[in-house]
Amino acid sequence: MIYNILIDGLCNIKKLTAARELFNSLPLKGLQPNIWTYTIMIRGLCKEGLIDEACDLLEKMDGNGCSPNDRTYNTLIQGLLQWNETSKAIEFVKIMVGKGFLANASTASMLIDLLSADPGDKVLKELLQ
């Protein structure tokens, strides 16, 4: 989808408002964002520190009949961890694992770093097993 490339490019050059407008215009053009479109927007929002909006978008995604996949969850979790939103990240790891998905190498590495900072965290230990 050409719109995915455009939205990704806009996010990469920090034109998030334009990316958001293009994303929101898709249904008006008779197009539905797909899993990659959502993941691209979530990554763009996370890069700019708009964590709550990224979390909301993932929830809207699921509500719009486009179920997140492991890449979508890993993208959001990595964004949360980069902005020190550890408790939210753990919540989404639990949801991701509950849906049968696994953390990718980068997410697992970030979780291991968290565990090394707090070796007594039972939740993190459980998630990494």
Q: What does each model-identified segment do?
A:
Residues 3-4, 8, 19, 24, ...:
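Pentatricopeptide repeat
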